[in-house]
Amino acid sequence: MTTGVQFRGTVPANSSRRWFTWGWPEDWHVTWYVVPTTPEQGGPQIDWDVEVERASSDDVTYWLSIQNTTNESVQVEARYAVLN
């Protein structure tokens, strides 16, 4: 298994941001997870969703939507794991 950070970003308070990452081989089994890197105690900071576009016969594009559920900006990392 291979893991890594695809990108880092900031999501402003009470808002959403959408990123995409392209050129992933269609035969890779990729899972995504998003982790806040801004510490804050007391509850969840983000919610996220991943959508998939088959960009070509060989490549996949992933669209990551991240929602900040707090009243402060949150820095995030979009992490991936290639399972095969």
Q: Which residue stretches match the model-derived regions?
A:
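Extracellular attachment/recognition segments
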Residues: M1-N84
